[in-house]
Amino acid sequence: QKSLQPDQMKELDALIDAETGALKFVPNPGPQTEAYFSLADELYYGGAGGGGKTSLICGLAVNCHHDIQMFRREAVQLRGLVKELSKIIGSTTGFNSQLGVWRLQDGQTIELAGVKDEADKEKWQGREADLKCFDEITHFTRSQYRFIIGWNRSTRRTATASPGPCCSTSTTCRPRCASWSSAAPRAIRTTWRN
């Protein structure tokens, strides 16, 4: 196999930079890109371990939204989100681990929270965000999920990530996962923004 010469590599890097602009996260080709550019208000994205589920929701948060809430069932599980976000952002500057709040230089706010007990959902009553992410959605109860997303408005978005058998592509969900959807009898509720 022949590798690129340093000048060719530099030229390739320049082409990539020109195409991606100021994006801190660029989705992988295929399903992750489809999910990233989906206009669905509720986005279910799944796959095998290491398939980029957490990367997708972190990338959406950093590149596309201003007020973000990211959830795991247990607060200790948030470490994976912190690690992925710091990789995308480039540092942990602005992250307050005591509060679970990340304030970025451009004014973005990313809140990280565990929703361990059923009653913990109440803490999010009336708390709007332009992106609500649930990492490992199958760990949450349907009630927790529906209550928390209930505070989204017409231009808001919810993204979920789950392991393999639940969700197969960016906008389809198999029946086992459908109980988290607002329209449980259907495979997924997809509301398109205009």
Residue ranges: model-predicted function:
Residues 1-194:
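Short, flexible loop motifs at catalytic/binding sites
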